[in-house]
């Protein structure tokens, strides 16, 4: 298929005052796509089609936990020139090999689980909350729900008790699918809820946990996944297939600001999104591929891509962020090197970690080998950009060793969830395989825009073209100075089509603000029309701040560039109308920082690189060095002068979803971080570096 086939076109006579043209994929210029094929209009249809088409082929694999090892290790650090011994609890895991089940088996299991739910009183008139880690059991139970037209409700593992109760109460969930280790977080909501009657555990909970549930909610029955499966086989029920307009899922957003909202996704929305993604990527991802499944299934990105994989006939390999690498397992390989995926999906934070890991290994090499790597990287990028031969030879000599860390056979990576720095995309696409940026939201069923593998280097720093099941336009934002009649056109991205959701549950004001009467969803993202009618994202409307001199600063754009630094584990930018430039709050990468300080000791930093992280973060010399590093990156990436930070605040603890500094999809919670460091931010503005 020719590259030009993926271009999108302006819809004739569609331009209105204050708006751009309406753009569509060339594949859907006449009519938007709403299915991958005739006869598939629901998730249950998808399951049946997958079993029919792929039969006894491997569908998904999982690893059994053999042993969990906990040990206390001593770490020696120097504090004020004295050695201090710190104790830290380390957990490692011993896992078995991947064990696989076929597409026919997935179908059989799903029908049995659906039967078991009906036998337990869970029907299409109720809902089932999924509050668990990503696993084959999660996915097959959800498929079981679809076989009986039972709507599911998704909640992140990191959701607090208030959020769990809200989702239970709003959706009137009668059943919960969960993991034993998450049961304690359910006790509070169970005490409040009158709806829940059944808890399905992915594995057998301890007697203590069972007693806790019984004492908290005596009317709630606990059953294991295996026992539910057996019950369904003993009491089989005929499938009760859903209709296209039935609710498939209430998917709760991760809530980077405010209260999580339940996005109402109909079966036809999910199938339309799958149809659009399939039209673009099925030329490249197929029955021969192995896809690593480790992102939260409560996130639309993972949810939709697993549905796509089911349809394509690829193999899903379930994994955990805790056991991805060889470093966190014993007597076995990590999930990446054991499963050896050919396709990897991830959020920018994952790809930044991979890049930093590669660079850390390179920096430990002798100087001549570092030069070989750097020269080979530059040469390969040159060859790719000009479509010249020679890349395979460079892979064989230099880059295959890098690829081995991800299993050695990756063909494509797909990035979503937030903006990926163009430099990171180019680096990994040269070292490992093409990294394809995409863009979508929960409200649009994820992949609304994507680049095809042969296009990544042609349309750098864009999110690609619209899939054939949506159309989009830009709308003026006068308050921020973005206009669609500028060159290039800029404005808020609005999306419409069969993949767009049915609104938010019980949020009339939010629905009124986000959706128009003629079906447009206002994404809140600011974009511009780039080369070939691709879409380039600028930032979220809420993250664009007017500075002292009246110019606007896009905070996420700044963060995406600084995230690439080996000194940075995470970053949050702040700007306001009282200052001309931003301040950046940095959670340092501890190993990267200590290595950097060792190499640069004696400049503005005269302390001990092995001091505690807390002391290093308070050190003005360290602050100066990190600020200098960020300023240099900003200049290299051609940030505007108003986007170059004027100060830095260093955070001495890891930002996680558990401590409420990140969402479950690893986006920074800006309001929380800024509130926590408000005093330090003002001090950073007052310093003269």
Curated annotation (Swiss-Prot):
Short name of any one Pfam family annotated for the protein: AMP-binding
Cofactor: Mg(2+)
Placement of sequence motif FACS: 518-567
EC number: 6.2.1.3
Record-linked InterPro entries: AMP-binding_CS (IPR020845), AMP-dep_synth/lig_dom (IPR000873), ANL_N_sf (IPR042099)
Protein's job: Esterification, concomitant with transport, of endogenous long-chain fatty acids into metabolically active CoA thioesters for subsequent degradation or incorporation into phospholipids. Plays an important role in the determination of viability in the stationary phase.
Family under the similarity heading: Belongs to the ATP-dependent AMP-binding enzyme family.
Name of this chain's protein: Long-chain-fatty-acid--CoA ligase 2
Residue sites binding ATP per the record: 252-263
Primary location recorded for the protein, binned into one broad class: Golgi
Protein keywords: ATP-binding, Fatty acid metabolism, Golgi apparatus, Ligase, Lipid metabolism, Membrane, Nucleotide-binding, Vacuole
Catalysed reactions, as listed in the record: a long-chain fatty acid + ATP + CoA = a long-chain fatty acyl-CoA + AMP + diphosphate
Lineage: Eukaryota, Fungi, Dikarya, Ascomycota, Taphrinomycotina
GO-annotated biological processes: long-chain fatty acid metabolic process; long-chain fatty-acyl-CoA metabolic process
Entry's free-text remark on domains: The FACS motif is required for catalytic activity and substrate specificity.
One GO location term (cellular component): endoplasmic reticulum
Any one GO molecular-function label of the UniProt entry: ATP binding
Membrane topology field: Peripheral membrane protein
Subcellular location field: Golgi apparatus; Vacuole membrane
Provenance organism: Schizosaccharomyces pombe (strain 972 / ATCC 24843) (Fission yeast)
């Amino acid at each position: 298929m020719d590259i030009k086939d993926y271009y999108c076109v302006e819809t004739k006579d569609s331009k209105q005052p204050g708006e751009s043209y309406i753009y569509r994929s060339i594949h859907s210029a006449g009519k938007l796509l709403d299915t991958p094929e005739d006869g598939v209009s629901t998730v249950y249809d998808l399951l049946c089609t997958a079993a029919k088409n792929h039969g006894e082929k491997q569908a998904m694999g999982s690893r059994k936990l053999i042993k969990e090892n906990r040990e206390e290790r001593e770490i020696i650090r120097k504090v004020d020139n004295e050695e201090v011994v710190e104790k830290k609890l380390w957990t490692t895991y011993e896992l078995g090999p991947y064990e696989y089940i076929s597409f026919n088996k997935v179908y059989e299991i799903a029908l049995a689980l659906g039967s078991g739910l009906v036998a337990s009183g869970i029907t299409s008139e109720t809902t089932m909350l999924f509050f668990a880690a990503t696993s084959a059991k999660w996915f097959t139970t959800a498929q079981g729900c679809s076989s009986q037209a039972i709507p599911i409700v998704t909640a992140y593992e990191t959701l607090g008790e208030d959020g769990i109760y809200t989702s239970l109460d709003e959706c009137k969930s009668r059943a919960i699918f969960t993991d034993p280790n998450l049961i304690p977080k359910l006790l509070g909501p169970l005490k409040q809820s009158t709806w829940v009657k059944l808890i399905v555990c992915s594995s057998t909970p301890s007697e203590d946990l069972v007693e806790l549930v019984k004492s908290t909610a005596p009317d709630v029955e606990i059953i294991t996944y295996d026992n539910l499966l057996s019950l369904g086989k003993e009491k089989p029920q005929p499938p009760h297939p859903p209709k296209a307009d039935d609710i498939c899922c209430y998917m709760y957003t991760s809530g980077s600001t405010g209260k999580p909202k339940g996005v109402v996704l109909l079966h036809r929305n999910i199938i339309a999104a799958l149809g659009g993604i399939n039209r673009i990527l099925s030329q490249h991802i197929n029955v021969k591929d192995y896809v690593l499944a480790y992102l939260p299934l409560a996130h639309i990105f993972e949810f939709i891509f697993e549905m796509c994989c089911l349809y394509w006939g690829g193999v899903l390999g379930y994994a955990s962020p805790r056991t991805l690498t060889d470093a966190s397992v014993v007597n076995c390989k990590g999930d990446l090197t054991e499963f050896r995926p050919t396709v990897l999906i991830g959020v920018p934070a994952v790809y930044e970690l991979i890049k930093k890991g590669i660079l850390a290994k390179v920096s430990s090499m002798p100087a001549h080998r570092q030069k070989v790597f750097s020269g080979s990287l530059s040469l390969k990028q040159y060859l790719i950009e000009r479509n010249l031969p020679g890349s395979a030879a460079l892979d064989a000599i230099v880059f295959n060793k890098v690829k081995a860390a991800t299993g050695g056979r990756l063909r494509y990576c797909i990035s979503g969830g937030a903006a990926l720095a163009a430099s990171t995309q180019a680096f990994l696409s040269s070292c490992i395989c093409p990294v394809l940026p995409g863009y979508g939201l929960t409200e649009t069923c994820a992949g609304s825009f994507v680049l095809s593998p042969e296009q990544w280097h042609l349309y750098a720093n864009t999110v690609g073209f619209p899939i054939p099941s949506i159309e989009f336009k830009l709308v003026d934002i006068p308050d921020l100075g973005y206009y669609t009649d500028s060159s290039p056109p800029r404005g808020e991205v609005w999306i419409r089509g069969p993949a767009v959701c049915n609104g938010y549950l019980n949020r009339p004001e939010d629905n009124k603000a986000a959706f128009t009467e003629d079906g447009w969803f206002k994404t809140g993202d600011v974009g511009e029309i780039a080369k070939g009618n691709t879409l380039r994202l600028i930032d979220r409307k809420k993250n664009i701040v007017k500075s002292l001199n009246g110019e606007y600063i896009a905070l996420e754009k700044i963060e995406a560039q600084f995230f690439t630094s080996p000194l940075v584990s995470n970053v949050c930018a702040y700007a306001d109308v009282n200052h001309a430039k931003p301040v950046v709050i940095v959670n340092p990468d501890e190993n990267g920082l200590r290595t950097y300080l060792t190499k640069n000791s004696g400049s503005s930093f005269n302390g001990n690189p092995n001091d505690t992280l807390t002391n290093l973060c308070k050190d003005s010399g360290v602050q100066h060095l990190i600020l200098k590093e960020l300023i240099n990156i900003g200049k290299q990436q051609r940030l505007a002068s108003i986007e170059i930070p004027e100060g830095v605040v260093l955070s001495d603890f890891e930002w996680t979803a558990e401590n409420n500094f990140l969402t479950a999809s690893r986006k920074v919670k800006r309001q929380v971080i800024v509130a926590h460091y408000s005093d330090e931010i003002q001090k950073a503005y007052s310093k003269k570096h």
